[in-house]
């Protein structure tokens, strides 16, 4: 009986630790989002620096790491942007040249529907935009019909 308890405890400690924390202290749900922004990355740093950011790395055959870019939560870089239903939190990836590799909408309370910021075409509009270029809603990014406040907030928090 004591052996059974010990095995259950060991299984919980070993198996459960992977549920709570992913690579280098990064939560698995965040790690999944980072991999969507940098599919070629083999590792990611924990949040560090000022402003707080993750660094995406690729490793070559010898194991040498090369930085691919950075990812940051918009709420940790710019003042809190509020949409129609509240804050909009996005994870933004930037390559080493200052070009957006992608965005992942994290948390929001905006209305859902055919023209939601959760739709893949919303995030796709930001990909390959250079952060040094002017950026305007309606020109660089299409607005979501009937969601002016949501879109304005999303664009301001990314740019």
Locations of the language-model features?
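Bacterial N-terminal signal peptides
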Residues: 8-17
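A composition-driven signal for long, intrinsically disordered, charge-rich low-complexity tracts
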Residues: 4, 20-21
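Flexible, solvent-exposed loop/hinge segments and secondary-structure transition points
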Residues: 21-144, 148-152, 158-159
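Bacterial N-terminal signal peptides that target proteins for export
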Residues: 1-7
